Regions:
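Extended aliphatic helical segments
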Residues: 1, 46, 70, 84, ...
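Generic recognition of flexible, low-complexity loop/linker segments
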Residues: 17-21, 64-68, 78-80, 126-127, ...
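Non-catalytic C-terminal accessory modules of carbohydrate-active enzymes
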Residues: 89-192
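Extended glycan-interaction surfaces of carbohydrate-active proteins
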Residues: 1-73, 93-117
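Well-ordered alpha-helical scaffold segments within catalytic/enzyme domains
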Residues: 1, 28-42, 77-88, 139-150
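Aromatic- and histidine-enriched alpha-helix N-cap/loop-to-helix transition segments
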Residues: 23-27, 69-77, 86, 128-135
Length: 192
């Protein structure tokens, strides 16, 4: 549905005059195991897609337009694939890279930031993204607890994962992680 803000193009004319590197970019094509659950996390399609997308990583995060620009928040989608595959180590490594590229409220720029350069953002770039903050907050929630598997309409067929991704730095002796009344498909969860 056109917004009225600008003219829309569809079909072949949309790529007319564009260099190929600007088309066919990785975006949400990695959402194969989570949240869609189309494939098992260890399925060849999932693992091959993750491996392919990582080839264009820069500074530890995803890029856009085949490596031309950094893209901070979309990295959360890959982190969730690693999370459900049980690869906590890679999920944490990518998470730390993600938050290194975020502001104090987890906001991030969508793109148009060149890798390994200064942080001067192209003035045509959308302002810091609240969506980045939302995705980061939800990712942290999923590190504490997340639901997965089975039939989403039948809780008894689903699994609840408590603290599936925890950094060793978060579990020092004498300290503890806690959740109080965290909402889930299984009701409110309290854990320490």
């Amino acid at each position: 549905v056109p917004t009225g803000l600008y003219d829309f193009k569809t079909g072949k004319q949309t790529s007319s005059g564009l260099d190929e590197y600007r088309t066919n970019c990785d975006w949400e094509n990695m959402l194969l195991a989570y949240p869609t659950e189309l494939f098992q996390p260890k399925h060849t399609y999932v693992q091959s897609t993750l491996k392919h997308i990582r080839k264009n990583y820069a500074e530890g995060i995803m890029t856009y337009r085949h490596g031309e620009f950094l893209h901070q928040y979309i990295t959360a989608n890959l982190i969730e694939q690693y999370m459900v595959a049980g690869d906590s180590r890679q999920a944490l490594i990518d998470f730390y890279h993600l938050i290194l590229h975020a502001g104090s409220t987890h906001e991030g720029f969508e793109n148009m930031i060149f890798p390994w350069k200064d942080r001067l953002v192209d003035p045509r770039c959308p302002s810091p993204h609240a969506w980045a903050a939302a995705k980061t907050a939800f990712l942290i929630r999923n590190f504490m607890l997340h639901e997965y598997g089975g039939n989403i309409e039948t809780a008894s067929e689903r699994d609840l994962y408590i603290y599936p991704v925890v950094s060793p730095a978060w579990t020092t002796p004498g300290e503890h992680l806690a959740m109080v009344n965290a909402p889930s498909e299984f009701g409110w969860i309290t854990s320490r």
